[in-house]
Amino acid sequence: MALWFVLLWVSSLQYAEVEAFFDWLKKADPAPTPPPAESIVPILLHGEAPAFEMSVVDEKFLAEAKQMELSPLDSCHFRVVAQLKATCSGLSEEQLAKLGVALFNCQSEVEGRRTYPCTEEMSIKECTADMDSDTWNAYHIVSNRARSVCYATRQQHFRKRAELTVNALISTATSQLDAMKDLKEGQKELRDMTAASLDKLLEGHGALQIQQGALKEGQEQLDASISENLQRLAQEKALISTGQQLVAQLIQGITQRMENVSGQLKDQTAEVQEGHQAILEDLAVVRGSAQDIYEKMELNLNGFLQQQNTTAHFYTELMRKLELMNGTLGYMLTYLDNMQTRLEDRLHMIQGYLGWAGLSLRALWTCVMHAGYFLLCAVLLSFLQCTTFSRVTLLLSVPINAIAEINQQAALDLISLTLLLFTLSLGRWFVLQLLWALSKIKGRTCSRPPHLSIYPPKEKTPEKQHEFGEKCPASSSTPVQSDPVCDLEVESFMMGDPCVLGVSPSRCPPKFSHHHLGGTPNHSTPRLKSRHSIAATELDNIPQRNLGVFLETVNRSRSSSPNQSLASSSSFSGRSLCSGITRLGQPCKKRAVVGQDYCRVHEGGHTSYSRL
């Protein structure tokens, strides 16, 4: 190992010369000229080898060039090539031309002729501006050989430096051989001394190993005895601590249990006392409640019996009314069957007439639809009391549309026809409004056009107001807008009042109003809705309608219906409802005894309601 360290140290000392030897591969700068051959011998004799460096500095290159035996032309060539910034192969055309000028100047300077200065800042034109034709031709000859001269100069320079380097390398190798011989002898002496030292070291290590073995055995025995003693001591301490903990836990558990038992006994005693007291209080309350309930049951026993009797009587009356309703419904079913048979016969008859007349089903359907539409619109216009224009429009448009559709001409459907009628009425109203506004603007006195309202305006004279006070009672709940008589007539007609539907006013029975009893219904079964009566003078103005057998049959069925019987029993009789109060606090719905205000249950003014 020591030999290798010495070799590395010697190599590090010679690193500078080796690096200088390989510097020519970098191609960074032109190499300086090698020193003359006369100067190499004294350098080799003294053992000093110059470093191989390539510098572009002119002074160093010239100092080396002076040491070599060169002609003035070669020296000039070396100086010119040393000033180049690039390699010979990397020169541009302009740089090559300037190199030719510099080489031509060297030739002229050696021959004593005129030179032409040319620097880096000057262009090639400025460098060759003063040349005549002969000089120009000579310059071209030199310029064509400029790259070759550059290569030759560089090779010559490298050859001189290589010779110098090889000579220095030989001198260094000789000195290294002498140093290696001395190092070899020192290594031999070192090896002998190292072997003797190793022998002595091995003997000492053997004796020391024997002593360490004896000490190890004694130490192991001592460790084993100490470990065994410590284990026994730890076990004894653990047993002692475990016993103490168990004893402490037992004592603590016994103490806690005693405290818990004492507290539980106290709590249970208090709870038992409180429960006993609460039970006594509850028993007292239950006893009082039972006494109150018993007293109330004694008081309400008669009321329950009376209510049971009332319920039985009501049930009997209900069954009787249900029997009447059942008979009425049977009669209605029989009548409907007869009516269906008649309608089928009439339809067969109409069908036969149509087949005999040769009419088509489509034309018949068109006529039926337009007739129904005409009747519906006529009723609606009459109900709304529209103007004559709307009625005339309906009277003209519906037949014309039906005739056009039967003749397969352009016709409107019912929806379009409705929109047409509505548009015409609305357009007329807008025109009247516009005319009224124009007349008002011009200052004319013109009556306002009629509004599209349901009820037409009427003048209210004192005579009519007096008649209205006589005809319409104050207890009417129907809102009056324009004409109360018309409202009553419309309501009576819509509700099916027999005074309007009948053939003559003499068939209308007189109507009596009920006494108001708290605003609640006073009968257990539904009754006819109370309506305003119409005077005989108003009935005279109603046109008589003979509906034939159908109206008579309806009147007969209505007279035999349970509603008519209820209405006759509730509205046409002079008996009022009972003024008593039932057990539930509701007014009694039974009829009062003749000449009294109470029924048989509440006779004497007593109520069946007893407060608890």
From Swiss-Prot:
The keyword Membrane applies. Disruption phenotype: Embryos arrest development shortly after the midblastula transition. During cleavage (2-, 64-, and 1,000-cell-stage embryos) all blastomeres of mutant embryos contain morphologically abnormal nuclei that appeared fragmented in formation of multiple micronuclei. InterPro entries: GEX1/Brambleberry. GO terms for biological process: karyomere membrane fusion; pronuclear fusion. It is found in: Nucleus membrane. The chain crosses the membrane at residues 364-384, 417-437. Residues 1-20 form the signal peptide. The keyword Iron-sulfur does not apply. Residues 452-476, 555-574 are annotated as: Disordered. Residues 556-574 have a biased composition (Low complexity). GO terms for cellular component: nuclear membrane. It is a multi-pass membrane protein. Residues 457-470 have a biased composition (Basic and acidic residues). Keywords: Karyogamy, Membrane, Nucleus, Signal, Transmembrane, Transmembrane helix. Required for nuclear membrane fusion during karyogamy. Has a similar domain organization and 27% homology to yeast kar5. This is Protein brambleberry. The lineage of its organism: Eukaryota, Metazoa, Chordata, Craniata, Vertebrata.
